[in-house]
UniProtKB/Swiss-Prot annotation:
Function: Component of the ribosome, a large ribonucleoprotein complex responsible for the synthesis of proteins in the cell. The small ribosomal subunit (SSU) binds messenger RNAs (mRNAs) and translates the encoded message by selecting cognate aminoacyl-transfer RNA (tRNA) molecules. The large subunit (LSU) contains the ribosomal catalytic site termed the peptidyl transferase center (PTC), which catalyzes the formation of peptide bonds, thereby polymerizing the amino acids delivered by tRNAs into a polypeptide chain.
Organism in which the protein naturally occurs: Schizosaccharomyces pombe (strain 972 / ATCC 24843)
A Pfam family of this chain: Ribosomal_L13
Domain of life: Eukaryota
UniProt entry tagged with the keyword Ribonucleoprotein: yes
Subunit structure: Component of the large ribosomal subunit (LSU). Mature yeast ribosomes consist of a small (40S) and a large (60S) subunit. The 40S small subunit contains 1 molecule of ribosomal RNA (18S rRNA) and at least 33 different proteins. The large 60S subunit contains 3 rRNA molecules (25S, 5.8S and 5S rRNA) and at least 46 different proteins.
Protein name: Large ribosomal subunit protein uL13C
């Protein structure tokens, strides 16, 4: 993401949440519009049980005499990621608020973005940043165990999308093979050159 683009779509699968959030926050402050898809596949370092206990303790933080006043805790992976990014932005200022509005976090890869190019952030990838022996867990599992109800729906939709994209890729690669074969046939090219092609 060294150059400015109209819209950056990041595939969050296999990224560490905090590291990805810091990179995204930096881009948002620079004026970039960012869409983060597959937030349920984000990773958090540390054992799952430890992270669950920490999150349950976080959910208990509320106003004693009127819990409806706040603090408000989100269960959906996209909202958890958005709140992580918000903590890295000056969201109470106009500049920070505008930056936060340029972020869109989603579970799965919904239709407008499934046919567009998606990027990864090498500085935030778990395989490059975490020791192989270290424990980690996904936000999708954590969210589903603390109250997120849509894990099954998102996984079904993702399975459908993967089947469609695999079929599209096979058709595209078969078409590309024909193009490559056509390019290598020199006799045909010589005949076409006679006619000015």
């Amino acid at each position: 993401m060294s150059e400015f683009q109209k819209l950056v779509i990041i595939d969050a699968k296999g990224h560490l949440m905090g590291r990805l959030a810091s990179t995204v926050a930096k881009q948002l402050l620079a004026g970039q519009k960012v869409v983060v898809v597959r937030c349920e596949e984000l990773n958090i370092s540390g054992h799952f049980f430890r992270n669950k206990l920490k999150y349950l303790a976080y959910l208990r933080k509320a106003c004693r005499y009127n819990p409806s006043r706040g603090a408000f805790h989100f269960r959906a992976p996209s909202r958890i990621f958005t709140k992580a990014v918000r903590g890295m932005l000056p969201h109470k200022t106009t500049r920070g608020n505008i930056a936060l509005k340029n972020l869109q976090a989603l579970e799965g890869i919904p239709p407008p973005f499934d046919k567009q190019k998606r990027l990864v952030v090498p500085a935030a990838l778990r395989v490059l940043r975490l020791k192989p022996s270290r424990k980690y867990c996904t936000i999708g599992r954590l969210s589903s165990e603390v109250g997120w109800k849509y894990k099954n729906i998102v996984s079904k939709l993702e399975e459908r999308r993967k089947i469609k994209s695999a079929a599209f890729y096979q058709a595209k690669s078969a078409n590309q093979k024909h193009i490559n074969v056509a390019k290598t046939k020199s006799s045909v090219n010589e005949k076409l050159a006679v006619f000015g092609y």
